[in-house]
Amino acid sequence: MRSETIGTKRSPRATIAAIVAAAGQEFGSRGLAGARMEDIARRCGRTKQLIYHYYGSKEELFAEVVSRNHEAAILELIGHDYDHLEPVEAFRAYLHNVADQYRRFPEWAMLTLDENLHRGVHYNERRKLRSLTQPLVAQFRRVLDRGAATGVFNPDIDADKFYAAAFSMVTACFMTGQVLSEYLAVDMRTEAGVAEWVDYTIGLLLAAIRPRAGAESVKLALQGVTI
């Protein structure tokens, strides 16, 4: 590889973007423990020396990758407008958009799982996580509140807890789908199987918050019937 000095005329911003993009691919496929700085340098066409100039350690670079990905995901999600949709359709669209991010960026699943193993410390080192997620949950809360106001959702839903439940269920096919598909009669590997899972979980979540929920509504949702 051609030697590159810190004094290169390349734009520092472009260099950092290239490093972070390459690191995201490596961390997303190999995890924090398995990724090597040599491979990141090779992928982005820079030297290890230059990477260490910007990031003092592999852990610091990982922290930058996960925090940037998290922020990018939030900014994209809150950029959607749901106010023109009826509450039920807004709810569906919101969660479909969450799932779609993981479909388009499969490396995010590994980054999320890896960061969970490290108890979220890398998020907290680089950003205040809660301040980033507050606008996202507020957007979700508005959908729930509009549904409650029109009588299609139960009132007084804890938006934070319900968002956590919804996120966990909808993204399960990306986080643990390979394992679950191996020993259960479910398909979370193919595009059609993922789409079916996302629709199924959204149906269950809707059944839980609809005023007419009760046993019959939940039973239909468990059977995969749209309610």
Task: Please give the residue ranges for each predicted region.
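C-terminal peripheral helix-coil segments that are non-catalytic and often amphipathic
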Residues: 1-3, 97-100, 104, 134-150, ...
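Amphipathic alpha-helical linker/stalk segments
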Residues: 2-7, 65-94, 131
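Helix-turn-helix
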Residues: 18, 22, 26-60, 64-65
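Amphipathic, non-transmembrane alpha-helical scaffold segments
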Residues: 20, 62, 66, 70, ...
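Amphipathic alpha-helical segments that line or abut small-molecule/effector binding pockets
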Residues: 21, 88-117, 134, 160, ...
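Short coil/turn segments at alpha/beta junctions that flank glycine-rich nucleotide-binding fingerprints
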Residues: 29-33, 84, 105, 150
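All-alpha amphipathic helical-bundle segments outside canonical DNA-binding/catalytic cores
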Residues: 89, 128-132, 149-165, 217-222
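Amphipathic alpha-helical segments used for helix-helix packing
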Residues: 104-127, 177-184
